[in-house]
């Protein structure tokens, strides 16, 4: 099982979503996800989150708290995702490994098909946003 740290970054009521690049054998290619990535040996999940956001987005983030942990089984891999609420502390996100980035409002989320592992968290956000 691969350990993944993912950042939930908000700005003005919007969530940052990233579109995955097309890669052979990647069942999430072309879908949208929260930024983050795989933990390296000996690395804490918080350090993983900071490193992945720096490498993939060119930004500094501060992990604030664990929002949720989920396990998902893809055809090619089983992952355990730890979603952190994170504060953007330096830089402006840029798509270094993704094909696109978007700051999406809740009413726009349906326009962005997300990876199956991220879908439950996005649905919970939708419930929180509904009066």
Which residues fall in each region the model found?
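A conserved beta-turn-beta hairpin within the catalytic core of GNAT-like acetyltransferases
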Residues: 24-30
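Conserved hydrophobic "DFG−1" position in protein kinase catalytic cores
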Residues: 9-10, 17, 88, 103
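The catalytic Nudix box helix
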Residues: 34-66, 105
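NUDIX/MutT-family hydrolases
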Residues: 83-85, 94-126
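Active-site-adjacent beta-strand/loop module that shapes the phosphate/pyrophosphate-binding cleft
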Residues: 60-62, 69-93, 102, 108
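Conserved N-terminal beta-strand and adjoining loop/helix that marks the start
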Residues: 1-16, 38
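Short, glycine/serine-rich, charged loops/turns that create anion-binding
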Residues: 14, 22, 71
């Amino acid at each position: 099982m691969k350990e993944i740290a993912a950042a939930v970054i908000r700005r003005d009521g919007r969530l940052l979503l990233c579109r995955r690049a097309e890669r052979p054998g990647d069942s999430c290619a072309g879908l949208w996800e929260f930024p983050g990535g795989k933990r390296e040996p000996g690395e804490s999940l918080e350090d993983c989150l900071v490193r992945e956001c720096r490498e993939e987005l060119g930004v500094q983030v501060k992990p604030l708290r664990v929002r949720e942990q989920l396990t998902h089984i893809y055809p090619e891999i089983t992952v355990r995702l730890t979603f952190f609420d994170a504060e953007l502390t330096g830089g402006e996100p840029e798509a270094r490994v993704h094909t696109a980035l978007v700051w999406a409002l809740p009413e726009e989320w349906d326009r962005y098909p997300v990876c199956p592992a991220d879908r439950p968290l996005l649905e919970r956000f939708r419930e929180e946003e509904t009066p």
